[in-house]
């Protein structure tokens, strides 16, 4: 079964207004999906970054005025972090924007990636990359809860990684839309 068949019609149109609530800084991440293998590319951030060190994330980052719009932000950051050139990326639409704990209003943009693209990791920002199988993510037994700093968090357990926080919320939004 092709879980990606109806994805495009279940996404939001991309908001290019560059508006942010509460003066949060704007940011965009790319949710890169490999269509044939039905996998999502994720990164593990390096420990030397100023925010979210060592966490699992999508390629992306802060909006820069020279970007012009958030699609360009996501494309620029994806190329900087994992070396995927814009010609290999087909942006489909957006998921719901989210407020992050680091005071960013983050727009997750969903894109299909050419299967044969070669990753070129930026070691300053990305410690490693891995792929999450969409069909595995859809299994209820991979969406778990656990305690961290005396708080309960939901997370996905994938390839020996715990995917929690903003990345978990983005994946949950995506997976909910895939089930429609």
List the predicted regions and their residue ranges:
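N-terminal leader/linker segments that precede catalytic domains of diphosphate-processing enzymes
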Residues: 1-57, 62-116, 126, 146, ...
């Amino acid at each position: 079964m092709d879980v990606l068949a109806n994805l495009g019609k279940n996404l939001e149109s991309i908001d290019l207004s560059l508006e942010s609530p509460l003066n949060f800084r704007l940011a965009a991440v790319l949710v890169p999906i490999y269509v044939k293998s039905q996998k999502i590319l994720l990164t593990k951030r390096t420990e030397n970054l100023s925010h979210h060190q060592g966490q699992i994330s999508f390629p992306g980052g802060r909006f820069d005025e020279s970007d012009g719009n958030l699609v360009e932000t996501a494309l620029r950051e994806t190329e900087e972090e994992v070396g995927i050139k814009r010609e290999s990326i087909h942006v489909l639409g957006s998921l719901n924007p989210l407020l992050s704990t680091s005071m960013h209003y983050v727009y997750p943009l969903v894109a299909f990636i050419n299967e044969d693209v070669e990753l070129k990791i930026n070691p300053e920002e990305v410690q490693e990359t891995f792929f999450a199988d969409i069909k595995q993510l859809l299994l209820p037994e991979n969406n778990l809860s656990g305690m961290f700093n005396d708080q309960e968090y939901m997370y996905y357990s994938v390839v020996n990684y715990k995917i929690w926080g903003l990345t978990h919320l983005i994946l949950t939004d995506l997976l909910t839309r895939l089930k429609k």
